[in-house]
Amino acid sequence: MNVGVAHSEVNPNTRVMNSRGMWLTYALGVGLLHIVLLSIPFCSVPVAWTLTNIIHNLGMYVFLHAVKGTPFETPDQGRARLLTHWEQLDYGVQFTSSRKFFTISPIILYFLASFYTKYDPTHFILNTASLLSVLIPKMPQLHGVRIFGINKY
C-alpha cells in the first residue's frame, strides 16, 4: 500500500488530449463556432466557413505552438518550460492517435471551407495560408526547432 503517493502524471499537459470525450468536445466547439458565425446577419456562408477555418487555426496555433511551458507546478525540474504544448503532447512521441487527430482536423476543416466557398481565389488563399501555418509546425522534423529564433525563450 502506497500511502501519500499521488496517482497522477508528472506533467498533466502530456495526456490531457487523450482524456475521455476530449475529441468530441473539440469537434462540438468547432461546430458551435461555425453556428455562431452563421448566425451573424451580414456574414455569408463562404465568409463564415473561412472565418471558422481561420479562427480555428489561429487558436490552434496559439494554444499548441506558441504558448510554452505548463500551467502546473511539475516535478520535472523545468524540462517542460521550454517546450510548446504540441511538443509536450504524448511525451513527445510522434504519430500517436492524438497527434494524428489534431493534424487531420484542420485539413478536414480546410476541405470543408474550400468546398463551401466554391474555391473562390481569395478564400482559397486565406484558407491555404491558415492551414499551412498550423501544419508546418506539426511536422516531426520541426520538433523543438525554433525558426529564426522565434519563440526560443
From Swiss-Prot:
Recorded phenotype for the gene knockout or disruption = No overt phenotype; due to the redundancy with other ORMDL proteins. Simultaneous knockdown of ORMDL1 and ORMDL2 do not exhibit any visible phenotype; they remain fertile and show no sign of neurodegeneration. Double knockdown of ORMDL1 and ORMDL3 show elevated brain levels of sphingolipids, compared with single ORMDL3 knockout and wild-type animals. At 8 weeks of age, both male and female ORMDL1/3 double knockout mice weigh significantly less than wild-type mice and exhibit impaired myelination and motor-function abnormalities. The triple knockout ORMDL1, ORMDL2 and ORMDL3 is not viable.
Checking Pfam families in the record gives: ORMDL
Annotated Gene Ontology cellular component terms: endoplasmic reticulum membrane
> Could you tell me the Gene Ontology terms of the biological process aspect for this record?
ceramide metabolic process; motor behavior; myelination; negative regulation of ceramide biosynthetic process; regulation of ceramide biosynthetic process; regulation of sphingolipid biosynthetic process; sphingomyelin biosynthetic process
Residue ranges, Cytoplasmic compartment? Answer: 1-21, 68-100, 141-153
Locate the transmembrane regions by residue number: 22-42, 47-67, 101-121, 124-140
Give the way it sits in the membrane: Multi-pass membrane protein
Indicate where this protein resides in the cell: Endoplasmic reticulum membrane
Q: Extracellular side: which ranges?
A: 43-46, 122-123
> Which keywords belong to this entry?
Endoplasmic reticulum, Membrane, Transmembrane, Transmembrane helix
Supply the InterPro entries for this chain.
ORMDL
Entry protein name? ORM1-like protein 1
Origin species, per record, is Mus musculus
Q: Which gene encodes it?
A: Ormdl1
